[in-house]
Amino acid sequence: MSSPDGGYASDDQIHGNCSVPIMMGQYEWTDPLTMFQDAKTKKEAGSANSRGKAEARIRRPMNAFMVWAKDERKRLAQQNPDLHNAELSKMLGKSWKSLTLASKRPFVEEAERLRVQHIQDYPDYKYRPRRKKQVKRMKREEEGFLPSANLAGPQVMGCNAMVGQNYKMQYSGQNSQQSQITPAGYFEDHNPVGYYYRGYNVSKYYMSQNSSGYCSPPAQGEYQALSYNFNSSYMPYQQNASTPAMGKQMAVKENIIQESPEHGIMGCQVSPQMYNGQMYVPECAKTHPVAQTEQHSSSHQSQQMVTQNYLPSQQDGHLESDIDKTEFDQYLMYEPKSDTELIYTIDQDSGAYSTNLLPSLISEANSVCYYDYCGV
C-alpha cells in the first residue's frame, strides 16, 4: 500500500527533522531576537552621540537665581512629587522674590565667581540663542498660503488693466442704453410737490435734497420727450378751456368750496401734483369743473416754463428788464393759501385774468434753468 502523503515526508516524520533547512540552506536565517538587539544597540549609540554633542556645546554661566534654584528645586520635588515642573518653577520664582538682599548675597557672589571662571575657560565664547523651530515652521506654512513675489510683476498689472478696461466698456455700454431708453418708473419714485410747497419759492434742488431719493436731472432728449408727453396727455383738458367770461363763475365756486367743511380734506386732494416737470392730477379731481380749469391753467403755465428755457439770450434780457423788483417781496413770506389763490389772480373789476403773472413765470423759468442745467 502506498502512504497517504505519497512518500514525500515519511522519513522526516520518522526522524523528526524538517527538510526546509536542507533545501534552503543557501539563505541566511536570523533569529528575531537578534534583530531587536541590533536596533537597541543602534539607539544607544545614537543617544551617546547626542550626549556628546550636548556636552560639546558650551553652556552659559549660571546666574544667582539658577545657583539658588539648583538645590531648592530638588528639595521641592522631593516634598511634592506630584507637581509638574512648571508648577515647581512658579513656586521657586515666588520664593526667590520674597527673599531679602542679605539672603541673596551669597548666591550673587557665587554667580559672579562662575562668570569670571567661564570667561577664563572660554575667552572666545559668544552667546547664541536657540532657534525656535516651531515658529519657523509656522512661518513657512504662512508663506505657502501667500502669493509669490514673481506674480506681483507686470503680468498681474496687465490683468488688472484688462479687467478695468472691460468693466469700463461694459459700464459705458449700459449707460448709453440707459440714456437712450428712459425706464418706465423714472418719475414715479419721487415725492410730489403739492400744497405744502410753493413752486416759485422752493427750488428743485432743495426739494430733491429733502426728498427720500435724489435723482440727477433728465437729459435733453428726456426733456424733449417729457414736453411731448405733457402736451399729448393734457389735450382733453385743453379742450375744456374756460373763457374770460367764466372768471366770475369760478370765483363763486371757489368761495363755495372754501366755505364747505370738506375743503380741509379736499384741499390737498384737488391740488395737482408735480413730478419733475410733469403734472399729476388725482382721479377725484378730474370730475370737478373747477379742478379741470385749474389743470388747464397749470398745464399752460408749465408749458410756458419749458418753452422759455430755450429762448435766446436777447429775448431773456428783454423780458428781465420788465420785471418789477418789488414783486419778489411777497414771495419771501409764507402764507397758507389755497391752490387756486396761488395759481390765479383775478381782477375783481373786469373779471379777467391779470397780466402780473408773467414776471413770476419768468423768474421761475430762470431758476429752473439754473438748477437743472448748471448742476448747482
Curated annotation (Swiss-Prot):
Residue span, Sox C-terminal domain: 259-376
Domain of life: Eukaryota
Keyword terms, alphabetized: Activator, Developmental protein, DNA-binding, Gastrulation, Nucleus, Transcription, Transcription regulation, Wnt signaling pathway
Residue span of region Required for transcriptional activity and interaction with ctnnb1: 327-331
Record's subcellular location: Nucleus
The keyword Glycosyltransferase belongs to this UniProt entry's keyword annotation: no
SMART domains, per the entry: HMG (SM00398)
Position of sequence motif 9aaTAD: 326-334
Gene Ontology molecular function: DNA binding
InterPro entries with a match to the protein in the record: HMG_box_dom, HMG_box_dom_sf, Sox_C, SRY-related_HMG-box_TF-like
DNA-binding region in chain numbering: 58-126
GO cellular component: nucleus
Coiled-coil ranges (or none): none
Main localization of the protein described in the UniProt heading: nucleus
Record keyword DNA-binding present: yes
GO biological process: gastrulation; Wnt signaling pathway
Comment field on protein domains: The 9aaTAD motif is a transactivation domain present in a large number of yeast and animal transcription factors.
Function: Transcription activator. Doesn't appear to bind to the consensus 5'-AACAAT-3' DNA binding site, but binds 5'-ATTGTT-3'. All of the sox17 proteins are required for embryonic endoderm development and gastrulation movements, and show some redundancy in function. In addition, the sox17 proteins have distinct but overlapping roles in later gut development. Acts downstream of vegt-signaling in endoderm differentiation to induce a range of endodermal genes both directly and indirectly. Also represses wnt-responsive genes to inhibit wnt/beta-catenin-mediated signaling.
Complex formation: Interacts (via C-terminus) with ctnnb1/beta-catenin (via Armadillo repeats); this interaction is required for inhibition of wnt-signaling.
Protein name according to UniProt: Transcription factor Sox-17-beta.3
Source species of the chain: Xenopus tropicalis (Western clawed frog)
